[in-house]
A protein has these predicted regions:
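Conserved Radical SAM active-site core
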Residues: 1-95, 101-117, 277-308
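Active-site beta-loop-alpha junctions enriched in small/polar residues
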Residues: 14-16, 63-65, 87-91, 125-127, ...
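Surface-exposed cleft-lining segments at the edges of enzyme active sites
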Residues: 90-98, 126-136, 171-180
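Conserved C-terminal portion of the radical SAM core fold
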Residues: 103-169, 190-208
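Catalytic cores of enzyme domains
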Residues: 153-260, 285
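Short active-site-adjacent structural elements
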Residues: 213-215, 264-268, 278, 296-297
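Local cysteine-cluster metal-coordination motifs and their immediate loop/turn environment
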Residues: 247, 255-276
Length: 308
């Protein structure tokens, strides 16, 4: 196994594939053929050919997996291993503009019952505050959700809003401010007391936080989690840390196959949607909402099929 390429698909940090592009993704798995642009140099494309044996795991990121649930039986039947990161937050359509929260709790529970609590990670991410969403609001809603999700997940990932430069205007329009250390301390202290009372443990992890949360038993998170992937696969294996992620990130190496500016949720805090929206998706194309320009693109083929 030493030196063999590891293929973990991240689907995706850049868009919500389960909510909007499940048909495209399922078709790519059927064909064993998928491509992604380099986000730094958009003219560089990596084109993967693979079979289930070549893919260690698929990490799904979503705010609404309901449209994708019908795909899971076929994905299981093909032999792919996967887990979900499911963001459930208490914001209204002022912040998360196109998310219907009416059945979100039921969807979380149904997905957990389908795949298991160990393969469903709850993300309360990010925590943002303004006059409508003060710290007390977050404490109440987090604790209520934690009680409802108890037994249906084993882990919750939290993060606090980062002031990306290109988000400054959106943050000002909604009077969003970064949390002070005292506000973070207040939030963490109260939610940890609730978690300690739950009959089934939910472990807290934090994503690349500057504030030290170790006093609250908060672990450094790995969204693309090598230890979890090894457990799901039933193997003893160490995965390499991803050098392309932010300092403090615990993720192992993966290939993100999403495309920026394709998510339709239109969350005001999102770092992945800062250009003209691409919504047309061709299931015959290995690229999401995109096609290969045979004149200007450089394509690197990576063939990981058995016997290739």
């Amino acid at each position: 196994m030493e030196g063999q390429q590891v293929l973990i698909f991240s689907a995706s940090r850049r868009t919500d594939i389960p909510a909007f592009f499940g048909g495209w993704f399922l078709e790519r798995l059927r064909r064993g053929d998928l491509a992604a642009r380099n986000p730094v140099n958009s003219r560089q494309i990596t084109h993967f050919r693979f079979d289930p044996a070549a893919v260690d795991c698929i990490v799904f990121w979503t705010k609404n997996p309901a449209p994708f649930m019908s795909c899971l039986d076929e994905i299981d039947g093909m032999g792919y291993k996967y887990y979900f990161q499911f963001t459930v937050t208490p914001y209204g359509n002022d912040i998360e503009q196109n998310i219907d929260k009416g059945n979100i709790i039921d969807t979380f529970i149904r997905l957990s019952e389908r795949i298991g609590a160990d393969r469903l990670i709850w993300r309360y991410d990010p925590v943002i505050i303004n006059d409508r969403y003060p710290i007390g609001f977050h404490v109440d809603r987090f604790c209520s959700m934690a009680e409802q999700f108890c037994g249906y997940t084993e882990k919750c990932v939290i993060s606090f809003i980062d002031r990306y430069q290109f988000l400054s205007d959106a943050m000002r329009r909604h009077d969003i401010t970064e949390l002070s250390p005292l506000q973070i301390e207040s939030f963490m202290g109260q939610i940890c007391r609730t978690l300690d009372t739950l009959p089934s443990k939910i472990t807290l992890s934090a994503c690349c936080e500057k504030t030290d949360l170790a006093a609250y038993g908060v672990q450094r998170n790995a969204c693309v989690d090598g230890e979890l992937i090894a457990r799901i696969r039933g193997v003893q294996k160490k995965y390499r840390k991803d050098p392309s992620q932010r300092p403090g990130c615990g993720c192992v190496q993966s290939r993100d196959i999403g495309t920026y500016n394709t998510c339709r949720h239109n969350c005001v805090y999102c770092y992945a949607g800062r250009g003209k929206k691409k919504t047309a998706c061709n299931e015959d194309s290995p690229l999401l909402c995109d096609t290969v320009d045979t004149v200007n693109d450089t394509v690197k083929l990576v063939d990981l099929r058995q016997g290739a």
